[in-house]
């Protein structure tokens, strides 16, 4: 915090072991507006995950239900990344807690390092918040990171 000149406000959360992109705002009003965009699904979120096995299809939409009977929906597409054979670009349509991890597990393709759903003992969960797109104050914003640096 000593390096940053502004107080920062967290505008969304990531699951504990998920790595990658997070957004912060420099003032409370903007933080509140961005948080509202997240809670009303007006922000497009993309993640990248690596698995030990592959899905039957290279691209698909998964629809499942969590223990509260709430619908979980995501789309995935197989992509090529350094160091991992089975990587997927994931677009979230709903944003429930542990959603990607749960849906991959329910569809028999758990994420590497997911101790909660797969018992996999790899030292790091290979799930990364990769890209966030939204419109605010009449402007479009797109933030993304290099997933090869995170999923190594």
Describe the predicted segments one by one.
Residues 1-152:
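RNA pseudouridine synthases
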